[in-house]
From Swiss-Prot:
It comes from Vairimorpha ceranae (strain BRL01) (Microsporidian parasite). Its cofactor is Mg(2+). The keyword Metal-binding applies. This is Probable CCR4-Not complex 3'-5'-exoribonuclease subunit Ccr4. One of its GO terms (molecular function) is RNA binding. It is found in: Cytoplasm; Nucleus. The gene is CCR4. Signal peptide: none annotated. It is an enzyme of class 3 (hydrolase). Keywords: Activator, Cytoplasm, Exonuclease, Hydrolase, Leucine-rich repeat, Magnesium, Metal-binding, Nuclease, Nucleus, Repeat, Repressor, RNA-binding, Transcription, Transcription regulation. GO terms for cellular component: cytoplasm; nucleus.
Length: 476
């Protein structure tokens, strides 16, 4: 246990003002405290809080604001009830609650997936909590039954224009990172039954069919799941044709069926496929003299095997060309330079393809693993990147493109497309060319719902990403 700084009987506000963030904890044990001041919860940097041996009867729910807390000692008080929001203190590793008057346990404590020390001895626990604690299964039980929150609002189409021509020809596109089973089963915060592969794929299928877009782009689809389930089920239920491409490592693995990749689906009645192309980012990178001469960049890139799928369609009603790009860029936030390199390759390849067709429309969508303030986003939407970042990335040349792409969700207040206990942000996008007019977008998830949970997946969402979709009109 880290040494607790001895700050007894200090005013909370003066503690915050006079002590730097080097102080890891506070010790207010045996001080006769009956109430906790809200000022305490402003000390969000502390990792350890000792409130043992006081006269506390209630713990304010706002204690969860101490998001960095790893050790919380509330033993030897007079506490009868635990606030459910303690379950949002996901960094807790040790929680001491012994010698209180606690009889019931909120299921939300099951979200404390990092908690390895949980003591609640000498409390009048009711059944089944008393027996579960003896068997060291109490937190596990809470995790499996942590379903005490209401569903989100129904997702609806939000019009982006006031007046529509009812005779206009529109089409819809959607993107959805469905979270691979390999990644899902390693998560510690959702109930394990929520992560069951069969349960998840049925929920994913239900989500897809309920939105029922004309063109669907999925990421993190495992090869066996595509071949054995999604390909046939989506053709049967939604009348989709499809194409799938696993990540590059599938070429060298014996068990290639477990490798995930990108899958693009389209309505057979509305589109005729002309061509499908694959962008293997590693292959393009390692064979490009602009990149492979940079030893540091080559070392950082390693064997990252991300891919993108380019599908060229003829729209059946109008005979116009539509290019749809399904992409999944590298995930790690520590590798902004690699994601930017992948974006350069992506836009250059897309520009080459677009020049092969007369006035094509373009929809570029997927999981870009990049925020709106990133170089990837500004490069795609503004064809720009700061000199500072160019120097930092050590690219060695000034990239550019002539594609005019806009973000379909730019005007929508959207707090996240990916939500986990450690990250909440917008990293999935739908970009479209100036030959298209945006007509509608699928509504996002309200903050009121997110306040109830520590992250996705959960009982309402089978992936840690949400489905994004847009409707477009072809310009004449």
């Amino acid at each position: 246990m880290e040494e607790i700084q001895n700050l007894k009987k200090k005013n909370y506000k003066s503690v915050q003002k006079n002590y730097s963030e080097d102080y890891l904890g506070l010790d207010f044990s045996y001080q006769g405290l009956k109430h906790l001041s809200y000022s305490l919860f402003q000390l969000t940097f502390i990792k350890e809080l000792n409130l043992k041996g006081n006269d506390l009867e209630n713990i304010p729910g706002d204690i969860y604001i101490l998001k960095n807390l790893e050790i919380l000692n509330l033993s030897k008080n007079k506490i009868k009830f635990l606030p459910a929001k303690i379950g949002k203190m996901i960094n807790l590793k040790e929680l001491y609650l012994s010698d209180n008057f606690i009889s019931n346990i909120p299921m939300e404590l099951g979200s404390l997936y990092n908690c390895t020390v949980f003591e609640i001895n000498n409390n009048p626990l009711i059944s089944p909590f008393n027996l579960l604690y003896k068997d060291k299964k109490l937190l596990q039980y809470c995790r499996e039954h942590n379903t005490n929150y209401g569903p989100p609002a129904d997702r609806t189409w939000l019009d982006t224009v006031i007046k529509k021509d009812m005779s206009e020809i529109t089409f819809s596109c959607g993107t959805y990172n469905i979270l691979s089973n390999y990644s899902a089963v390693r998560l510690g915060y959702p109930p394990t039954w929520v992560l069951n592969p069969d349960y998840r794929k049925e929920n994913i299928l239900h989500n897809i069919c309920s939105i029922n877009v004309d063109i669907l782009c999925l990421q993190e689809v495992e090869t066996y799941n595509y071949e054995d389930f999604y390909k046939d089920q989506l053709e049967l239920r939604c009348e989709y044709s499809s194409v799938f491409q696993p990540k590059g490592r599938s070429k060298n693995l014996t068990d290639s069926k477990s490798v995930d990749g990108c899958a693009t689906f389209w309505k057979k009645s509305k589109f005729k496929i002309k061509e499908n192309l694959v962008i293997d980012f590693y292959s393009k990178f390692i064979n490009d003299y602009r990149f492979n001469k940079n030893i540091n960049l080559v070392s950082r890139y390693g064997k990252k095997d991300n891919i993108a799928l380019i599908s060229i369609f003829e729209i059946s009603q109008t005979k116009q060309t539509l290019i749809v790009v399904n992409v999944h860029l590298y995930w790690d936030p520590e590798y902004e330079d690699i994601k930017f390199v992948q974006a350069i390759i992506l836009l250059e390849e897309l520009e080459k393809v677009s020049k092969c067709y007369k006035n094509p429309s373009i929809v570029l969508l997927g999981d870009f693993n990049s925020l709106q303030n990133s170089s990837v986003y500004s490069f795609i939407t503004q064809n720009s990147v700061s000199n500072t970042n160019l120097c930092k990335y050590n690219i060695g040349f000034i990239p550019g493109h002539f594609l005019k792409l806009s973000d379909a969700y730019l005007s929508e207040e959207n707090d996240f497309t990916n939500f986990t206990p450690t990250f909440k942000g917008v990293i999935d996008f739908i970009f479209y060319s100036d030959t298209l007019e945006l007509r509608s977008i699928l509504s996002t998830i309200e903050n009121e719902y997110c306040d109830q949970v520590v992250g996705l997946p959960n009982i309402h969402f089978p992936s840690d990403h949400i489905f994004l979709a847009s409707k477009f009109k072809l310009k004449k």
